[in-house]
Amino acid sequence: MGAMRKATFLAVLMMISGLAGCFGGDEDENTEEIVAVFTYSPATNIRSGQTIDFDARDSLPAGVALTYKWDFDGDNSIDATGRTADWSYPEVGEYTVELIVSDGSKSQSTTKTLTIVDATALPPTADITSYSSDEDCEGEDVDTGSYIHVWVCDMDKSNTDRTADSEISIELDAEDSTSGSSDDYISKYHWDLDIEFDADGDGDPANDNDLEGETVEWKDLSPGEYEIGLTITNGKGLTDSDDIKVYISYAASWLDFEMGGNTSGSPVELDFEFLVHYDQDRGNTIRKAVGELTYPKIDGDCTDITPGDGNNCRAKLDLHAFNEEDEEATNTSNTAVDQRKDGDCNSDDNDCVHLTLSSYLFTDSESESTYGDGEWTIKIRNNRVNDLQVESLVIRLVYK
């Protein structure tokens, strides 16, 4: 009898143990936050009677059984269920669409406003005016195309300011945009000054309203490459967009300054700084940077250590380029003194030596021959004992 009671007790104990997970059961309940997200197509210029496809597949959390309820007309009643749905609106106007997503224990909703326009309305055409500077900083013609290319010429900078940098303002013009029909008009001009960055956080990086107006001034623009967008809306509520590349190239020069001589066993250097952009994800990539140094072959104040020798008076200045980690990328030291006629060096009394930094140098790869973008420095280096009056240094940042 005792053995039977013991067996019965063990059986009951095992049954209770097996049912332990069935009671009090919060452990398996989903604790992740519900995030309701939906898109719709077409996203713009939706016409009365047109079928609109709604999709909530981006709602979170992924991998969890969710339910979806749609209210398409703002009357707080459910018009459709399911992760996808379609709807149409017979009348022109604005409609609020609500999506409610639930995991059975909690829910979250989101709303969007749709503008429905007349089925016969004509869309506008957005058109950003392209243009280029007439000349670059050398007086050469600048190519034109379906882009904006502006040269900034910061010539004859002070020798106490050895940074190649400047900010300018440029004009953006949409006067060639059209409303769609002769009896319509353009009611809104919205400019997005960086179509890769979602400034308003609505999930669309190309629809930010940074500036408004048919013609606007874009201020505080530094050398670089930019992609901007324009969205216009006509009186019927239809929209159209255009985008364009903007290139700001730059040149700075320093004229008639002194370069000290190496009288202590260490070369004398002058540093000139410039900022380089090479960001492929943002589409801001420099094409090349160039340093151009012109100096007299022989300094007028030079005295030979050995009278009549002349070797001591033959100048040789070099350009050395360093990235922001102070790693040297390249230099001109291997260019012989009788080979220094780069560019338009038309004087027999001067040396002209150029240092070109291609875009490849500014990439950020695993290769030992690339150095990244950011703050760079060009150093003028004098290894020789005599000082020298330099005629000019030019730094060009070419983005187109």
Where are these regions (language model features)?
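Acidic, Ser/Thr/Pro-rich low-complexity intrinsically disordered segments
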Residues: S266-D342
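Secretory targeting signatures
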Residues: M1-Y40, T44-R47, I52-D58, Y68, ...
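C-terminal edge strands of extracellular/lumenal beta-sandwich accessory domains
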Residues: K236, A252, P307-E327, E366-K400
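Solvent-exposed segments in extracellular or luminal domains encompassing
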Residues: R83-E94, N207-E225
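A short beta-strand segment in extracellular, disulfide-stabilized domains
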Residues: N45-L60, D156-S179
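Solvent-exposed loop segments of extracellular immunoglobulin-like
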Residues: P61-K69, G180-H190
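Conserved structural position at the C-terminal beta-strand
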Residues: V101, I232, I380-N382
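C-terminal edge beta-strand
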Residues: A85, T110-V117, L238-S249, L393-I395
